[in-house]
Amino acid sequence: MAQTITQLYYHVVFATKNRIEIIREDIEDELYAYIGGILNNHGSKLLIGNGTSNHSHFLLSLSKNLLIPSIVGTIKRDSSKWIKTKGGILTKFGWQDGYSAFTVGNSQLAAVKKYIANQKEHHKKHLFEDEMRGFYRKYDIPFDEKYVWD
């Protein structure tokens, strides 16, 4: 082929350090817009971001020039610095060290967007840890509980 053409979608999830409930609703929209800006600066897009006070879900459309570990590291580093500027308890903010990322096919986009949009309602009934265990089982990803949670 004369050129490289890709369409790469990822559902990325990461939690706050020790899953502390620290992300305030009053900064969420601005946080996800900020993360969208980080992605735009790297030739990528945030299709939707949402979560709860202790974790966030993102549906990303990534540039063919990016590797998931490097862009997730950039998102976490830069957004953490931004959140700390909000003052108060947020000056102690941090994301967990790890993350989970799942590929998403075009036919799954609408369902994943809906799932992410409904996070607050979903977590009225389901714990974050149970949610992640469900993903790992659904996608047949081996995991060891000792190393999943920090």
How should each PLM-predicted stretch be described?
Residues 1-150:
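Basic nucleic-acid-binding interfaces
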